[in-house]
Amino acid sequence: MSKQTVALSKNPLRLSGPAYGGDYNPEQWDAQTFERDLELMLESGVNMVSIGIFSWARLEPVEGAYDFDWIGQIIDRLHQVGIDVDLATGTASPPAWMANDYPESLPVNADGVRLGFGSRQQYCPSSVVYRERSRALAGALAKRFGDHPGVVLWHINNEYACHISECFCSTCRTEFQNWLGKRYGSVEQVNIAWGTDFWSQRYASLEQIDVPKAMPTFPNPSQRLDWRRFSNHQILGCMTGELEAIRKHSAIPITTNFMGGFPKLDYREWAQHLDIITDDHYPDPADPAGAWEIAWQSDVMRGLANGAPWLLMEQTTSAVQWRRRNSPKRPGQYALWSLQRMAHGSDGILQFQWRQSFRGSETFHGGMVPHAGKASPVWRDVVDLGQTLKNLAPVVGELNSSDIAIVIDWESEWALEVATGPAEHDSPFEGARAWHRTAWELGIATDVVGPNDPLDSYKLVIIPQVFIDRPELAAAAERVAANGGQVVVTAGSAVVDDNLGAILGGYLGSFKDLLGVQVVEHALLTGPDYLAAEADAERANQVNRLTRAVGTPAAETWLGLATEHEGLNVILGSIGEQGTDLRGGQWAEHVVATIQAGPTERADRDLPADIVAQGFAVAGLVGDAEIIATFDGRGGGVDLEGLPAITRRKVAAADASAKPGSAWYVATDLDCVSRAAFLRLVTAHARGFPVVAGLPDGVEAQRRGDILFLLNHSDKSVELNGIVGTELIFGQQCTGHVVIAPRSTMVVAP
């Protein structure tokens, strides 16, 4: 890939250096302020702004009557001074005339309440009027500005589904029925897929099916999963409708801004339609894990871009306004976190917004030009970063690379969310995030990929809690192992089919043969619910003669693990001053071998009769699956004592030129220390290494091509040795020993 070209997908956005700027709303200011803004933009190094994002009421003040002259004049002036435009379609916030003239376009919540006008995103994604008028506006803008030399990017809508991810109106009811008809072909197939004989939910026709609005108790989980799919489909249809309208008149690249691992929309499906992946992200400066949040979200975006660069569309220069308390970024953190995004693949740093609002719901959201203007230290940070980015032109277009992939699956997240059990799921991509953070803390670069993405180039693939059984993913994982790679599958994977039907005969579905094990029972810990209910359990148990004798290991929050694996024991012994132990969390499982054992090979413990009848072994896992760790009875694991907690199956090489690989199964959610120890073991088998070994606390290293980013997230200066090359920010030569100031970055080219 050539430098200075962001070949994110099908239609490259050409840049002379990193994009820098932000959302700009000149309609909120007078003409004098606009001219002053142009001066300040040039002073700060701004080369791109996004305009028109919430301008529908100005662009179409009366239905069908467009007023584009004002925005055309703004685009012309920006182009005259050399500032590119990311032109939005304005459709994120329909105007008052739509709400008043077409009240049916307003969304309805699950309780049947139609929401009102006066905020933003107040539209039903199935509304015929909204869809027609949004497509018409996008098409008219493209016809007018589709070949304007100052417009370099189309920006459809804004943060789809951030407020309204579903609507329960009568139009959506009809559209849901139509969608089901296309998906299943008949109402009887819907009945089969949803299991409607349960609780007498059978339907005689598609017209009987309602939206899953407020109900007396648990709704049908399969219906809710399809409702998630339908809602994603409807909102995606709004976006593709505008995209098609634009494409009739313009070849300029098209995007819509994502929000990281946002759980409501399947961004992997959405990304296929876009030319450029863009992201909005607002980590909390008060959160010590904020830097990791940036690494995670950036790696997700790069994965959506199929490994190519992407653009940061929104961040704040200082503080946001929407948290209960809003902390500003610390000195140096604005630049540090911006360059961290570039280290993870972004070719631009854009903000919300250019000039801080003085009215409205985002008055106290930070901007590049704060309320205090140039008197604010934020302004100096903005100018400094602009200069820094000018010096980083060689980074543009360079690619990240990794030998390790973590798989995420949006539909599995939906399935976990809507399933009635085994546990509530309120933390999206919890498993993937945990493994990604462990890799990041170890200094290991990772890619975040989807279940259908190619995996053959990776040495290690981690499949964490992919709840829906994916046969194609299992086959791809087996190829990785057969080519000498390592595959890790974790608890909670391959539990249900595509319609939330339980995998019968043992969980792990299509992965059973690869792993050599299957799950016969979930054994989750609930935490100290009962004890929390007793104000003073110790005092109460003086008289609760019966209750005090009852054992409740499930009230614990952790499980102890034991290992006889020499390599893992060595790693555990190296952690901390006196070594450490293995521990699991609240999700645990009964694991048995997938091949039959003879009577003498069965463990002497109580198991369900059907399992014993099939001859499944527990201890020893007869066959080619070996036990790496067992539950040792500590914490809440007394009933699991002796059962496998981590297993490994060696996989024969696909051909004589390949080395054998391994497939590992982790039957609990390891805590962060245990996860780190285990990942060190597995990466050693995969011959994976940190980007730069032996870095001090707080220092992150990432590579884009041959360019090395060194980011000091700590409050102390750090000294590094062995750093050789040209430091791009200041243009200095590094000859081995370097010092990086607190919350600062070095970018070194060979």
PLM feature spans:
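Short, well-ordered coil/turn segments that N-cap beta-strands
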Residues: 15-20, 45-47, 79-85, 147-152, ...
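The substrate-binding groove and active-site-proximal loops of carbohydrate-active enzymes
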Residues: 19-31, 52-69, 116-135, 160-165, ...
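Polysaccharide-binding and catalytic clefts of secreted carbohydrate-active enzymes
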Residues: 111-276, 280-296
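Carbohydrate-binding surfaces of carbohydrate-active enzymes
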Residues: 203-209, 248, 260, 271, ...
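Short, acidic/polar
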Residues: 28-43, 134-140, 259-270, 330-338
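N-terminal carbohydrate-binding accessory modules
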Residues: 1-50, 61, 76-80, 84, ...
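Aromatic-lined substrate-binding rim segments of carbohydrate-active enzymes
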Residues: 35-43, 47-114, 142, 241-249, ...
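Conserved, mostly hydrophobic/aromatic
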Residues: 22, 41, 49, 78, ...
